[in-house]
Amino acid sequence: MKGTFLICLILIAGFSFKSTQAGSICLEPKVVGPCTAYFRRFYFDSETGKCTVFIYGGCEGNGNNFETLRACRAICRA
């Protein structure tokens, strides 16, 4: 019984951490980067509460940079 409780507690803590981490990624600003590639990406715009398309240059980005609209919406719950 004690072991089951401990496993449940660890799982809950892990999911909470992942949710908090994803939430902080979604609050990061859009970063185009200094490079000159042309990648169509999506970021979560915290002001509008929506995932929006932008052009990523290919380097020095951050976590708020998703290859698909679906991925952006799944992580940021938009």
Curated annotation (Swiss-Prot):
SUPFAM superfamilies: BPTI-like. It is found in: Secreted; Nematocyst. Transmembrane segments: none annotated. This is TauPI-stichotoxin-Hcr2b. Residues 1-22 form the signal peptide. The record marks 73 as: Has role in the stabilization of the complex by binding to different residues of TRPV1 subunit D. One of its GO terms (biological process) is venom-mediated suppression of sensory perception of pain in another organism. PROSITE patterns: BPTI_KUNITZ_1, BPTI_KUNITZ_2. The record marks 36-37 as: Reactive bond for trypsin. Residues 26-76 form the BPTI/Kunitz inhibitor domain. One of its GO terms (molecular function) is ion channel inhibitor activity. GO terms for cellular component: extracellular region; extracellular space; nematocyst. The record marks 53 as: May bind to TRPV1 subunit D. The record marks 23, 28, 60 as: May bind to TRPV1 subunit B. This protease inhibitor shows two different activities, it inhibits both the capsaicin receptor TRPV1 and serine proteases. It partially (max 50%) and reversibly inhibits capsaicin-induced response of TRPV1 (IC(50)=54 nM), a receptor of the pain pathway. The second activity is a weak inhibition of trypsin and chymotrypsin activity (Ki=1 uM and Ki=5 uM, respectively). In vivo, it shows antinociceptive and analgesic activities. It significantly prolongs tail-flick latency and reduces capsaicin-induced acute pain. A synonymy between H.magnifica and R.crispa is controversial. It comes from the Eukaryota. The record marks 70 as: Important for modulatory effect on TRPV1.
